[in-house]
Each structure stands twice: as C-alpha cells, then as structure tokens.
Amino acid sequence: MVLKSVVPLAIAAPVFLFGGNAVDAKPALMSDTIEASEVKAAQDAWCGALVSISKAHTEGGLAMSKPLASGVIDAAYGYQFGPVAFKPTWTKGSTTFRETSAGALSYFVGGDPAFKDSGFAIGTPGSNRSPWVKCKPEIFVIQSFGSTANAMGWVHIEAADGSKSTVDKTFGYLRDDNGNLRIVVHHSSTPFVSN
C-alpha cells in the first residue's frame, strides 16, 4: 500500500490517500466548509431559543419550557454523537461540566435534583427572576476547518425588568450528515471583574 499526500485547493493540511492515484483524486472537502454566515445564523438561533424558552417558562412553567428546551438541545447540540464539552456559566463543583443532554436540560430549565440548577434559560438569577427578552451575539473570532468551526465572543442578554448581562462564549460546531451545525463545544463564563 502506498501512502500519498494531496493538498486540495486552499486546504493547508495534507489529505492522505491509500492506494489509487493522486491524479484521480477528487476530494469534495471544500463543499463541506462551514461559512461565517452559518456560524452567525447558528448563534442567532441559539439566542432566539434562549428567549423562547424563557417566554415559555413565564407562560407555563416547566410544563412548557422543559419540552421546548429538550427540543432545542436535540436540534442544536451534538449529544447524539457522544459527549459534548459544555461548561455553563452558572455551575460549580462536581456538576460544572454537562457532557450529557440531561445535564444540559437541567442547566437550561432546572428541575433535576441530580444537578440542582435554577435554570439559566428561565431568566435572571435570584429569587425575583425576570425572563430574558433579548439576546444578541457579538462574535469576535470565527475559525473554520472544513466541517468544524469555532466561534468566540460575547452574548448580550436583557431581562424584562431591564437588567442586562454579558457572557463570554466559545462555541465549537460540527456539521452533521444533514448539513446542520451542531454544538459540540460550549464554554460560557462571566467576564472578569477586578477589585
């Protein structure tokens, strides 16, 4: 078996073929490249889902918000491929990382005694919670590597009571077999505040 290296079009990393002739190779790698516009659309959709989950919870509690959040997680995240590297903002200790969809669902809407979450998507923290009514991503970096991409920036959220928050976000995306972007890395934290 002969190992040959081919660099198709603008891809810098080598593609290895076993056997065959490199002249006959017709890699279709570039058609799978995730575009910046797709990443922006995915982040806009994530923000829209956050506001929708919050609204559903305001209107019908967990009975409405939990099924919606579950559907959002199934559609937007890549848990069907295996563990997702998800580090939410409002977590700590042994339940900081949410590699399962059950952990993600608890983080977004609460109601799972295994995680003891208050539900980030429901609204502002504390006892006098206010639902999220606006969410806008501000992306600083998009890196695209064929069928995967990374994005880093802020998400600005606003509650019905007028309170605002900015969260640092890093998302890693994988294109699935149907062409949809799936979140496989999601790191979230609050910006550093000096004393």
Report each predicted region and the residues it spans:
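Short beta-strand edge/turn micro-motifs at domain boundaries
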Residues: 144-152, 156, 161-195
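Bacterial N-terminal signal peptides that target proteins for export
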Residues: 1-9
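Bacterial N-terminal signal peptides
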Residues: 10-17
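Surface-exposed, charged secondary-structure patches
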Residues: 87-158
